[in-house]
Amino acid sequence: MKTPADTGFAFPDWAYKPESSPGSRQIQLWHFILELLRKEEYQGVIAWQGDYGEFVIKDPDEVARLWGVRKCKPQMNYDKLSRALRYYYNKRILHKTKGKRFTYKFNFNKLVLVNYPFIDVGLAGGAVPQSAPPVPSGGSHFRFPPSTPSEVLSPTEDPRSPPACSSSSSSLFSAVVARRLGRGSVSDCSDGTSELEEPLGEDPRARPPGPPDLGAFRGPPLARLPHDPGVFRVYPRPRGGPEPLSPFPVSPLAGPGSLLPPQLSPALPMTPTHLAYTPSPTLSPMYPSGGGGPSGSGGGSHFSFSPEDMKRYLQAHTQSVYNYHLSPRAFLHYPGLVVPQPQRPDKCPLPPMAPETPPVPSSASSSSSSSSSPFKFKLQPPPLGRRQRAAGEKAVAGADKSGGSAGGLAEGAGALAPPPPPPQIKVEPISEGESEEVEVTDISDEDEEDGEVFKTPRAPPAPPKPEPGEAPGASQCMPLKLRFKRRWSEDCRLEGGGGPAGGFEDEGEDKKVRGEGPGEAGGPLTPRRVSSDLQHATAQLSLEHRDS
């Protein structure tokens, strides 16, 4: 790793790997793009333009060739390189600028410290040029947990609202807040500062004439922290003119006499976005106290880049999956500030398992579940299905039937659900294939004498008479298809001369077997008997005419 003095550049180790061997995976594409943007010899190939963090690729083929040389891939072209850039869209590292060709924009406030957790800002060397991008609003590559809920505020809100600070905050914190409120600056990068400033011993010819910046800001001069002199240092302000390698085409500085305080560290944001930003997250009163550092007053110890602090910092950033701008990482513990925490899907309490309870209507259960109650509620079982309801109705109908009113209630139950077969009728089920082979004794005389007797094919003695109320249910035993089939076979036997009497007896026997009552036996068979008699008479007349 070259020293910052050698390279003239002070990106941290994780952001730029100049000593990585060709073909290695130690450097990423966005690191390489930042490397090209900082070098003046590649200004005709790629350069900053437009908004903060926006750059344009002027020669896509040359950029792809340089990337291929760096990665030892001679077949690299811009098509492959653009696919690699699209991979960064989901990573929130950069995105494509709509309406502009070959123009992309870095999301510097989304570049978080994940893969390179242990860095020491105090050892960042001496050379801090202006060629690197400035500190973005709300954070930088060194993204600390926000000390205020400023990320969830809209940009149109008043940035000069007084900060929420406690009376126990340190005098240093109060002085910084007073200066920033007096300045009224909104954006962290409104002054064109970079996170990597120029060194104290830079070339005086590069600075335009003007009063020095250190004595230009209001308030007392910023004292160095006595307990840790290596972490925070006072850095000079940048030049007042436009910078050729800065993301800003024109520096937003009003002039050399702007009232700006010196920068504490290139890794820390300078001015608040909406509320007061602090030099370190642990200088804020919103940071939980109890640090064990030398400065126990105010918000606790300073951020020391210890493994515990870095672990706590990384855990805060891993919670930004759901509700990114309403994540709990934006609301640190502060006793005087009540912030409603968002409902996260992974922290919703699971309802307990519901025991067997009597069913309730679905509307009532939905209303009870939708209403938020402070106590735990039990879920009701789902309503009964069609089979369970039918079984319940059968049980109720059977109880009412055994109670006494058999006829009327049986008809009502039959209208709601199919009733069970009547126990009084002794009928053997006959399938469609076996129906033609059933042999029944001749009961044609009984049909005329005693039509109310139902007989089975194999039981010579007459069974008990059925109740008149159950006769309609018994008439449904024979399927309609079988009934038409037997009528057709009977007509065929009559036309073929097989004797109408035998066919008539078979039909009567089938009706007896299927358990039809006397009313039905006389009703549907009467027109059929007439038709069979007419057919028999016409057959006899035709035979007589043929004989004569």
UniProtKB/Swiss-Prot annotation:
Polar residues biased stretches: 532-541
Phosphoserine modified-residue sites: S20, S24, S185, S190, S327, S431, S435, S444, S531, S532, S548
Keyword Membrane tagged: no
Biased composition (Low complexity): 362-373, 394-403
Keywords associated with the record: Craniosynostosis, Disease variant, DNA-binding, Isopeptide bond, Nucleus, Phosphoprotein, Repressor, Transcription, Transcription regulation, Ubl conjugation
Keyword Transit peptide: no
Comp. bias intervals (Pro residues): 348-361
Biased composition (Acidic residues): 431-451
Annotated stretches, region: Disordered: 130-169, 184-225, 280-304, 342-478, 492-548
One example GO MF annotation: sequence-specific DNA binding
GO cellular component terms listed in the entry, alphabetical order: chromatin; cytosol; nucleoplasm; nucleus; plasma membrane
Phosphothreonine carried by residues: T3, T7, T441, T526
Crosslink site: Glycyl lysine isopeptide (Lys-Gly) (interchain with G-Cter in SUMO2): K465, K481, K512
Description of post-translational modifications: Phosphorylated by multiple kinases including MAPK1/ERK2 at THR-526. Phosphorylation regulates the activity of ERF.
Family classification: Belongs to the ETS family.
Matching PANTHER family: ETS, ETS DOMAIN-CONTAINING TRANSCRIPTION FACTOR ERF
Function: Potent transcriptional repressor that binds to the H1 element of the Ets2 promoter. May regulate other genes involved in cellular proliferation. Required for extraembryonic ectoderm differentiation, ectoplacental cone cavity closure, and chorioallantoic attachment. May be important for regulating trophoblast stem cell differentiation.
Designated name of the protein: ETS domain-containing transcription factor ERF
Gene: ERF
